[in-house]
Each structure stands twice: as structure tokens, then as C-alpha cells.
């Protein structure tokens, strides 16, 4: 029989451990396991934290690229082709890169207006652009991402029924094929003031001018295929004195509230005076006879807006002076048509030509023809020129023969060579006689605008995207 411990006996440490060994085992096992887990985890030094913070704050999209994102998909259905732009914005309306670029931009030819009698084929021409654009938007965000199709002047020239049939086919394509969000007015023909004001917003947004006084913004001339738009900010006083537009015409002034400041934007769109449409207007002046704007050696037909126009060159070749004369005629540069104090051409009020017009950015076909004519670098997104540079290039183009065209102007597409004299003369005449610029005045030709360390296409769709993501 084992004797009991005496009540007064002193218990050693070994005896205590022996007596409580079960409890100690239960406590020690989890502690050991936790220690092993911590030991096996990778270490994180102070320098690691600094590197991660630096990379977040110095990536192209900035610190907000991890926050909420809004995408917008904008189709530009122009007269010379269809284009799609995909943009991504953070909560501050700053652009976030898509891959290595600040936008996804894709284009193809011909445009919707090339299918005036086949709406379904017109809509299907957008399928490849739509699929690639939608694939760039995260799947979970597609139902919240606005898609817009803005048809411009080329479709307007087809007439209401033909253009509406094409637009309806595009609506059905988006409904049946896309997860993107379409509103009731998502597919439409843009009116001239929309196109011009969106372009103005785009360029001034990229230049970070929005929020500044109107005189610190830049004016914009956008020469498309079917129409040309002029837009610039004017004073409240000039806006108040703006003449009322004729019946059926758009208002001369749009009020826009951007970045905390109200702007009064003069904007006008000249339908039939885009570069491709203007060719038809100039050919109409000479009717079916020889035209002094056509390069020597050409005798063909010019097709535009579903119509054909005879385009025979003069036997003596093109003439810059004679081409200028009939171009001024086509522009209707005639003071008797002007019922206002100041006009551009065709009896249109010019907006007063205040501070918002002192710096002019000129886009689209102005840049393209200047690059093809060789007096700006096509690889550079921006170039500073003077209107007289177009006249100088026109002299060269008007004096050549058609067979010399490819060697003289290697960057010009063959189908455009017969009309190169006409295009350059028209652009010079539009700037000088139409918009009243001085021949030696400095203007900025713009293809893309630098935004941070990226270059963004200087086109109206970005302005439309800003409006889309700002709407509820």
C-alpha cells in the first residue's frame, strides 16, 4: 500500500511538472504548431513595404487604378470608316490604362454609309470591332458599361429612312450579341453641336484645361469626311448676344458645366463641308465640265453619299488659282448671305472670335493630309503649322501629273491622288476664307494629345465617354 504524501511536505518542481503534465501538453502543442507556421512564412522586410507602396503610386494609372472603375465603349460611325474607342476611368474621371495604352482603339473601312440599301450588312460590319471591344471589358462590369454608336455626317447624307434602317439594325445587333448597357438613345445620328462639343471637351480634357477660365481653353476645328465643326468657348456677353438659329438649325451656343465651371460653348457643324463631302460640292460647281482642281491626266467618277459625280481634269492641268475660285464659290463665302455682324461662310455667325479662339487645335483630315503631303511628321501626334503650309503643298500637287503622283507624294493612297490638289486647296480656303484665320497664323495639327506619359486619340468619342460615365 502506497503511503500518502504528508500535508506539510514541500513539493519539488519535478513533482509539479509530473503532476500537471497533461495540462502542459494540451497548452504546448498549439504553441509549437503556431511557431512552426510563423517560421515557415516568408519574411517581409521594411524595404518590401516601401517597394510595394512605390509601385502602387507610380504606376501609369496612379493610386486610383485599384479603386472603382467605369468603362465606356464608343463607336464612331463616320463617313470614311467605323472606329471603336474603349476607355476606363477611375472615380476622379482620370483615365486608367488598358494594357499599354490609355484606350483601346480599332478601326475598319468602309463605314456604315457604304451599305445604303443593306442595313443588316451595315450592322454586321461592326461585329469584329464589337467583339474585340467587349472582350476588353471585365465580364462582371459589362452590364454596367455604356455602349454608344454615334453616326456622323456620312450617314446623315443618306436621308432619314435609309439612315434609320441602318441604325435600327445596329440596335438589334447590340441587343442580340452584346452584354453591354444600351440606353434608348445609345445608337443615333449625332447632330452637329454634339459632335463639335464632344470634340472640344476631348481636347481640353486631355490638355487639362477644363476648370480654367474660358480664355485659357483652346478652340477646335474638326474636319471629318462629311462635315466640319468649329467649337470654342466664348464670354457670357457674347453668348447672350448670339443670334437665334434659323428654323431646323442647331443653337449656336451650348452651356456646359465641367470641372466646377460653366462654359458657354460656340459650336457649329457645317454639313456637306467635310473633306469628302466638299469634293462633291466643288464638282457640282463645275457641273460635268472640266474641273481645275482635278490632277492632270485623270478622267473618272467620284462617288459619295450614294451618288456619282463626273471628275474630269482640265486639258491644261489643275490650276491653284482657278481651284481657289470655285472652292470659294462652293463655300458660299459671300457677305450678302450674312445677316449677322460677323460670319464665317454660308451666312453662319462666327461666335465673335473672342479669347477662346486665340489658340486653335485642328484635327482629323487636316492632320492626315498634312502628313501625306509631307510637311508634318506622321509619326508625331502633334505638329505646329500655318495655313500657308497647305497652300505651298497645294501648289506642288496642282502642278503635277497623275502618273507622277505616287513618286511625288508616296504617302497618299492611290485613290486620293486625283483629288489631292482639290483637298489641299479646300483646306487652305476653309481656314482663310471660311474661318478667317491669317495665312501666317500658327495652328496646332493634332492626331493625339499627350496625357501623362501616354498619347490619346484626339477624337469626339472621349467627350461622349466622359458624358456617359458621368450620367446615372
Curated annotation (Swiss-Prot):
CDD domains: ASKHA_NBD_AtAPY1-like (cd24041). It is found in: Golgi apparatus membrane; Membrane. Residues 43-472 are lumenal. It comes from the Eukaryota. InterPro entries: GDA1_CD39_NTPase. Expressed in roots, root hairs, root cap, leaves, stems, trichomes, phloem throughout the plant, guard cells, filaments of young stamens, stipules, papillae of stigmas, pollen, pollen tubes and the abscission zone of siliques. ATP binds at residues 73-83, 219-229. GO terms for cellular component: Golgi membrane. One of its GO terms (molecular function) is apyrase activity. Keywords: ATP-binding, Calcium, Glycoprotein, Golgi apparatus, Hydrolase, Membrane, Nucleotide-binding, Signal-anchor, Transmembrane, Transmembrane helix. The active site is at 195 (proton acceptor). It is a single-pass type II membrane protein. Its EC number is 3.6.1.5. Its cofactor is Ca(2+). It is an enzyme of class 3 (hydrolase). Glycans are attached at residue 334. Disruption phenotype: No visible phenotype under normal growth conditions. Apy1 and apy2 double mutant displays developmental defects including the lack of functional root and shoot meristems, and morphogenetic and patterning abnormalities of the cotyledons. Double mutant exhibits a complete inhibition of pollen germination. It catalyses: a ribonucleoside 5'-triphosphate + 2 H2O = a ribonucleoside 5'-phosphate + 2 phosphate + 2 H(+). Gene3D superfamilies: 3.30.420.40, Exopolyphosphatase. Domain 2. Belongs to the GDA1/CD39 NTPase family. PANTHER family: ADENOSINE/GUANOSINE DIPHOSPHATASE, APYRASE 2. This is Apyrase 2. It comes from Arabidopsis thaliana.
Amino acid at each position: 500500500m502506497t503511503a500518502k504524501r504528508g500535508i506539510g511536505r514541500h513539493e519539488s518542481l519535478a513533482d509539479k511538472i509530473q503532476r500537471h503534465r497533461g495540462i502542459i501538453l494540451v497548452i504546448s502543442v498549439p504553441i509549437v504548431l503556431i511557431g512552426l507556421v510563423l517560421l515557415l512564412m516568408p519574411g517581409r522586410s521594411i524595404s518590401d513595404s516601401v517597394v510595394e507602396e512605390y509601385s502602387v503610386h507610380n504606376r501609369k494609372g496612379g493610386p486610383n487604378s485599384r479603386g472603382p472603375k467605369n468603362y465606356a465603349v464608343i463607336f464612331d460611325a463616320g463617313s470614311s470608316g467605323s472606329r471603336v474607342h474603349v476607355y476606363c476611368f477611375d472615380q476622379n474621371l482620370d483615365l486608367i490604362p488598358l494594357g499599354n495604352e490609355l484606350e483601346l482603339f480599332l478601326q475598319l473601312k468602309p463605314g456604315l454609309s457604304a451599305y445604303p440599301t443593306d442595313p443588316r450588312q451595315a450592322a454586321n460590319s461592326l461585329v469584329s470591332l464589337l467583339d474585340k471591344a467587349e472582350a476588353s471589358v471585365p465580364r462582371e462590369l459589362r452590364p454596367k458599361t455604356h455602349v454608344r454608336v454615334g453616326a456622323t455626317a456620312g450617314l446623315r447624307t443618306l436621308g432619314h429612312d435609309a439612315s434609320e434602317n441602318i441604325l435600327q439594325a445596329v440596335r438589334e445587333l447590340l441587343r442580340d450579341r452584346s452584354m453591354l448597357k444600351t440606353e434608348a438613345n445609345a445608337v443615333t445620328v449625332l447632330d452637329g453641336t454634339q459632335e463639335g462639343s464632344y470634340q472640344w471637351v476631348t481636347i481640353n480634357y486631355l490638355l487639362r484645361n477644363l476648370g480654367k477660365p474660358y480664355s485659357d481653353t483652346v478652340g477646335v476645328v474638326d474636319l471629318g469626311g462629311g462635315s466640319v465643326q468649329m467649337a470654342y468657348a466664348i464670354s457670357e456677353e457674347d453668348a447672350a448676344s448670339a443670334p437665334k438659329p434659323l428654323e431646323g438649325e442647331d443653337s449656336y451656343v451650348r452651356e456646359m458645366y465641367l470641372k466646377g465651371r460653366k462654359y458657354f460653348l460656340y459650336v457649329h457643324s457645317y454639313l456637306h463641308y467635310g473633306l469628302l463631302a466638299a469634293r462633291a460640292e466643288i464638282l457640282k460647281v463645275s457641273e460635268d465640265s472640266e474641273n481645275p482642281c482635278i490632277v492632270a491626266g485623270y478622267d473618272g467618277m467620284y462617288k459619295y453619299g450614294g451618288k456619282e459625280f463626273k471628275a474630269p481634269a482640265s486639258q491644261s492641268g489643275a490650276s491653284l488659282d482657278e481651284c481657289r475660285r470655285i472652292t470659294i464659290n462652293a463655300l458660299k463665302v459671300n457677305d450678302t448671305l450674312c445677316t449677322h455682324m460677323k460670319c464665317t461662310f454660308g451666312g453662319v455667325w462666327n461666335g465673335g472670335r473672342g479669347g477662346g479662339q486665340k489658340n486653335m487645335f485642328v484635327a482629323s483630315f487636316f492632320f492626315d493630309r498634312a502628313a501625306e503631303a509631307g510637311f508634318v511628321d506622321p509619326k508625331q501626334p502633334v505638329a505646329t503649322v500655318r495655313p500657308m503650309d497647305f497652300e505651298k503643298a497645294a501648289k506642288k500637287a496642282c502642278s503635277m501629273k497623275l502618273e507622277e503622283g505616287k513618286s511625288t507624294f508616296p504617302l497618299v493612297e492611290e485613290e486620293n491622288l486625283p483629288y489631292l490638289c482639290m483637298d489641299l486647296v479646300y483646306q487652305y480656303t476653309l481656314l482663310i476664307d471660311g474661318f478667317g484665320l491669317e495665312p501666317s497664323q500658327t495652328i496646332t495639327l493634332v492626331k493625339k494629345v499627350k496625357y501623362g506619359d501616354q498619347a490619346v486619340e484626339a477624337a469626339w468619342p472621349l467627350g461622349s465617354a466622359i458624358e456617359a460615365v458621368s450620367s446615372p
